Amino acid sequence: MKKNLRTASICVQGGYEPKNGEPIEVPIYQSTTFKYDNSEEMAMLFDLKKEGYFYSRLQNPTNDVVAKKIAELEGGVGAVLTSSGQAANFYAVFNIANCGDHVVASSTIYGGTFNLFGVTLKKLGIECTFVNPNDSEEEIQKAFRPNTKVVFGETISNPGCAVLDIEKFARIAHKNGVPLIVDNTFATPINCRPFEWGADIVTHSTTKYMDGTASQVGGVVVDSGNFDWMAHADKFPGLCTPDDSYHGLTYVKAFGKMGYTTKLVAQLMRDLGSIPAPMNSFILNLGLQSLHLRMRQHCANAQKVAEFLQNDERVAWVHYSGLEGDEYHALAQKYMPNGTCGVIAFGLKGDRETAIKFMDSLDMINIVTHVADARTCVLHPASHTHRQLSEEQLKEAGVAPDLIRLSVGIEDVEDILDDIKQALDQI
């Protein structure tokens, strides 16, 4: 077993240890089911008394190898791949919270997640209070209720590029006896490992930087194994009391630090599905092998682009925490001293139509919903990803009407700058 590998080596070789004569690349187990020689062996799998595979809706060897690699990158004890980042965030919360429960979440999060927490979870009987992440601990504490079960935030918010004070949010969550979930999609474990700052569970849309090529849609939930569920057993009956659907098994008692991820697979994957296809996981693993190299280039290119935008008189404002004058620069230096990500938020002087004209004038840079892959792309969140929100909700989410989200890729930075310059000349 490979031990104590550094981050770059985990990207390349983590999660998979081929034996003598086996393929060097992770095999694709494109099979729905798995054969056993006797009935008793399969019965033990269904009772969770034996490790193994019997149906790919629950677990698949290809998926598990890639999940293990991501867990190693984040410093977690276990991980579960999902079919999308949205599924990962839903499962991470729904594995803890039930009908009648409450969630506290940062207001500066991705529009789809904002809607998931504010609308969809509400239909399931789970209410959410959104808080300004820049507020004091005392102010955020006011959002908590006796039935609060989890706190949620994004390391770097999408699309506003705000940096979460992870230690502060972890401190507040733990004071109230609940775990902190952090969506680490934009920073990736290359630039930030939230578990080292007190987070308990990490999620990703693996569709983004981890994949890097816009070739597959996926997500992942990673557990640190650090949260003491039994110390707050009254809050988390699903983890700390017998499960009637598994002959009275209690997940935390039976599986210890793996209790959270085991429950996620045994209950949520069993009942709701959302497992990725093995081929998608294979593609994701190819992306992970170069993640450390790509993030370095994303950050270097984004820094140069942000500095250019900051100095152009046609630009009204720029949010990129790599800039010394940015309001989140100090937090970025604390949590991500080696770089943040390739995403920049900025606004042009003028109105919403000015932003649209600029985007329509771009040549090499693509207008797409996607973000955080090898290609440089651009989006106007108020018109696209967040268009379902009201003006008040847009303000609460930190999405200004003039905000342009620029995801800087790994092309030659001079070509990126040339395209931005010619588009600015046309507004």
How should these model regions be labeled?
Residues Y16, Q30-Y36, G225-N226, L288-S290, ...:
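Glycine-rich beta-alpha junction loops
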Residues G118-V119, E127-C128, K142, P146-K149, ...:
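PLP-dependent enzyme catalytic core of the Aspartate aminotransferase-like
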Residues N38-F90, G112-T120:
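Conserved N-terminal alpha-helix of the aminotransferase class I/II PLP-enzyme fold
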Residues G75, N147, R314-W317, M364, ...:
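Glycine-centered tight turns that cap/initiate beta-strands
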Residues M1-N60, K68:
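N-terminal "arm"/small-domain region of PLP-dependent enzymes with the aminotransferase-like
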Residues K2, A8-E17, A79-N311:
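Conserved PLP-enzyme active-site core in the AAT-like
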Residues L272-I275, M279-S281, L286, S290, ...:
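Conserved small-domain helix->loop->beta segment predominantly found in fold-type I
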